[in-house]
Amino acid sequence: MINGDIILFALMVVTGVNLARYLTALRSLIYIMREAHPLLYQQVDGNGFFTTHGNVTKQVRLYHYLKSKEYHHHHDEVFTGKCDRVRELFVLSVSLTGVTLLAAFLL
């Protein structure tokens, strides 16, 4: 029989891998954003986004931009595709984190 600790460990590994995928896609989105949408790049503090002194308010601006799908009106297909990917990976990472936390409390 499969032990509960093994299930929890497997969920944690899958969540960690998907979180790494999300952060990598977010980093590449910010890199593409520099050329495709310079105004948004400045609004979300593109240079300091992943630093320890990053402005959380500006990071939330990117979250709302992706949540409301404002990027659908953009002319660059690479940028809109990357925004879709980051949005999907964010939803997947948050849901996997929730499932992992639920499993940790139940097991």
Swiss-Prot record:
It comes from the Bacteria. The chain crosses the membrane at residues 6-26, 86-106. InterPro entries: Universal_stress_protein_B. It is found in: Cell inner membrane. The keyword Membrane applies. The keyword Cell inner membrane applies. This is Universal stress protein B homolog. It is a multi-pass membrane protein. Belongs to the universal stress protein B family. Keywords: Cell inner membrane, Cell membrane, Membrane, Transmembrane, Transmembrane helix. It comes from Vibrio vulnificus (strain YJ016).
